[in-house]
Amino acid sequence: MGNLEILAKTFLVYGIQTTGKSAVNFLFSRGAKTVYIYDDGDCDEIQDAIKLDNFDDVKNLNIDYCILSPGVNVLGNKNIELLEKLDIPYMSEFCLGLTKAQGRNVCITGTNGKTTTTNLIYDLLRTQNNEVFLCGNRDTPITQVVNNTTKNSIL
């Protein structure tokens, strides 16, 4: 997915909280033709996005890709099973951002100590480079900052 084409494509963003809203704005900024939005709970309207009230509506739409917010559990999720049945590729908002980010990436995973480790690495990198972005699931969505990255950036 490193060369993900966004221009003139149709997307579904599944999960419309902070990260989902950021993904919608990012997709439109990169020339997406249509962006549908869906959330298992209540979600606000987003300008230019088309809200789906029923996930089964994806059967009648020509969706190229689905972007998942971090809160969407893929295991045992009937909506994800439908995407797979319809051969609609899906990825996280974070992966979407990584496909378009310039520069280098530092990714931290694990069970304990992620926030402390992230803050420590961020502070260390900032002493050497002023193009360091702190983003991901805990703070700022990656799609909120990726349009500001350069080849010298570190995410």
Regions found by a protein language model. Name each.
Residues T10, V58-L61, V74-L155:
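Phosphate-binding loop of NTP-binding sites
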